[in-house]
Amino acid sequence: MNVLFISSEVAPFSKTGGLGDVAGALPAALASLGHDVKVITPRYRDLRGAERLEPTGQSLLLRFPFGELSGPILSARVSERLEVLFLENAFLFGNRHGLYGDAGGAFADNHRRFAYLSVGALQAAQRLRFIPDIIHANDWQTGLVPVALRRGFQTGPLAHAKSVFTIHNLAYQGQFPKDVMGDLALPWDLFTAHDGLEFHDTVNFLKAGLVFSDALTTVSPTYAREIQTPEQGYGLDGLLRHRAHRLHGILNGVDTHEWNPEDDAFLPARYGLKDLSGKAVCKRELLARFGLEDGPAPVFGFVSRLAWQKGMDLLLEALPAALHADIRVVGVGSGEGPLEEGLLALQSRYPKQVGVHIGFDPGLSHLVEAGADFFLMPSRYEPCGLNQMYSLRYGTVPIVRATGGLVDTVEGGLDGNGILFEAFHKSALLAAIRRALALYADPSRLDEFRRRGMEKDFSWGASGRRYEALFHDLVAE
């Protein structure tokens, strides 16, 4: 099959979170199964690996009521069957830092930026004579793709393509004032609540994807069920229940080449199931990197976007009580100012027990996964989550709240590979930490937990085959 994959970020070129990881890994998994895959994404100003980009000799010209937009299509060949294409436009992407916003908030023209991506990706496929069987859009930034496919490309070479829309996080919906309908030349008959883009008198890009796509997926089976409830449906649960027969929960995989303790260039010592001794070396190096003394105390780590969703406020609430025990806590992340400040204040208050790095540091993130004994993920909700799977691969026991993809990947109980807690409450998290301390006091049992986690297969191969089966079913309809 020919698969066109459209995403607002693609690792390693651009990334703010899990979407970038998926957009980098799933197309590669599909290509390895023998499919021809092209990924289309913006050419941002701060693109990593920009030196790899080559001109295709083709360019876009899109006409909107606010003006004409044009720009070249650039290419980075990843493998024989996988190519990443970049849509360049100085006015929308090249004139600013950041993907979606800056310190002042979301960019005011995001509706224009991602309309250009959505429509431009389809035009780019035509210009490059790539005729997809499947067009796979992701999150609100590409929600207009299936709309454009039905309303602007319903004749011609893309007419028979099937559309798939993946919800990576339902909370982010891309809502804009209704006057963007005119700004983007969207037909007003689409501004309806039942089967259109209208949502509480706004234009909702995510809803557009949910309504107009041939199939919907989300990133774990549990999350697919959760988003059909009023508690986690963010106002779209009724629509999702209506389209439940088209909704599939497919668990994300992880990049097993990048995240492999047996061959991780970021680690001072490698290790695996047959020999875990290198993990102790990583623990010593981790403590040294944070200026903490080596010793017998267990190390609890986290690598996270510092956000309400991730439960970092709950962690801040619980840690002072947890630090009465002889433990170490180290973390890497950035995000909401009050959470950053709270973690730095905690580090100042407990300088011998807490180490915090504010910012994105891939090497340090790998070292936390390898060197920590336990990994903290107290998420309010978690569509899939990746770090708990990294932790399991690295023999680091995850402590997670029982929600979303965390339920689908972490096994609790005496014969499990992790520790789960139900209630989003300080007492529940502290109880989970106490269970971790009891586990740490029993080295043979801790070793069993580690090994059970390391034996799990979270490769993209399994996820890729699930998507492949879905794509085949769609094409056969």
Curated annotation (Swiss-Prot):
ADP-alpha-D-glucose binds at K15. It catalyses: [(1->4)-alpha-D-glucosyl](n) + ADP-alpha-D-glucose = [(1->4)-alpha-D-glucosyl](n+1) + ADP + H(+). One of its GO terms (cellular component) is cytosol. GO terms for biological process: glycogen biosynthetic process. PANTHER family: ALPHA AMYLASE DOMAIN-CONTAINING PROTEIN, GRANULE-BOUND STARCH SYNTHASE 1, CHLOROPLASTIC/AMYLOPLASTIC. Synthesizes alpha-1,4-glucan chains using ADP-glucose. This is Glycogen synthase. The gene is glgA.
